[in-house]
Amino acid sequence: MFRRLLIATVVGILAAFAVAGFRHAMLLLEWLFLNNDSGSLVNAATNLSPWRRLLTPALGGLAAGLLLMGWQKFTQQRPHAPTDYMEALQTDGQFDYAASLVKSLASLLVVTSGSAIGREGAMILLAALAASCFAQRFTPRQEWKLWIACGAAAGMAAAYRAPLAGSLFIAEVLFGTMMLASLGPVIISAVVALLVSNLINHSDALLYSVQLSVTVQARDYALIISTGVLAGLCGPLLLTLMNACHRGFVSLKLAPPWQLALGGLIVGLLSLFTPAVWGNGYSTVQSFLTAPPLLMIIAGIFLCKLCAVLASSGSGAPGGVFTPTLFIGLAIGMLYGRSLGLWFPDGEEITLLLGLTGMATLLAATTHAPIMSTLMICEMTGEYQLLPGLLIACVIASVISRTLHRDSIYRQHTAKHS
């Protein structure tokens, strides 16, 4: 048992450095090509001329597509192992290391160039990859899946500063057959990754800064639960739209470079209306939480960002949709809150409360993981007083979504790439 805890600690450290490496590579490319040192792609897009804002995501997609197509042609005669931690957990726990690194590099290109896709997907992949590499050298084969799970949880903890949610992500979403006793090493890896990540970044701040002064009362619980119902209906719709967009891009029968370039071009066109469509949505979420905009502004940015996310994910841009889903949920919750605010005197607080609820419940509706989704929002924002209400709302959203759409976003992803 102590051997496992020691290995879990090492895996957590490796994962933290893997995440930090991707983050610093991203900052370097942003500085080199976008002359941006703020760490915000929205700021980068704002400072670019319109033609550069239009073409940059397309060029990034083209470069990533050429990289992926070139690697595919180079290795077409080789047997293929999984290049995704979800696939590796469902098979024999082995990775195609070179292909996974190429996929991560392609993700770096599309993320840095502004595509509306999550950078955290590549971070978690690299963390799981580092764990797998260590495990194959120093642990028996029957433990490989456990250490990949630890690496993925640690990567999520380092990326989102949410170790408990990262651990439950593994338990609820990826490793449902995992025995409860195996959660110990997963939690150790996640916590160690967070601590090492804090040391690397010289900060232990929460991922999102929120000033919510509301005391949750009976009326607020009713609003939170109703938001859960709304998210339970919106989750399957979002998954259906993502499926439809993917099929639409595939039906065009374009080569990968042109398919990714088209997705990037759509993002570029949308960014002419608002630069907020660039990136995974982190900075836009933070700005909304700091000062909730008016109803029409939220609606406009929401529609543009939704189309950008659908274009990026549908075109096959390598990356995650976890953080973009958080923004979509926030916008849905805030739109609902702004509508209700017309009848309540404390409309600002309701908008903020339901925005946070929307983040958690849409995440639960798309992942079918209500406990993880609840803890994720609480850990990212520090608003633990919302825990009881969010848990109820997330369970409701998950049940409704599962009834309407059998597969979660991750099962849908696995089926699409199998």
UniProtKB/Swiss-Prot annotation:
Compartment(s) where it occurs, according to its Swiss-Prot or TrEMBL record: Cell inner membrane
A cellular component annotation (GO) from this entry: chloride channel complex
Predominant place of localization: membrane
GO biological process, one term: response to acidic pH
Topology in the lipid bilayer: Multi-pass membrane protein
CDD domains, per database record: Voltage_gated_ClC (cd00400)
Keyword Disulfide bond on entry: no
Function: Probably acts as an electrical shunt for an outwardly-directed proton pump that is linked to amino acid decarboxylation, as part of the extreme acid resistance (XAR) response.
Protein name: Voltage-gated ClC-type chloride channel ClcB
Annotated source species: Escherichia coli O127:H6 (strain E2348/69 / EPEC)
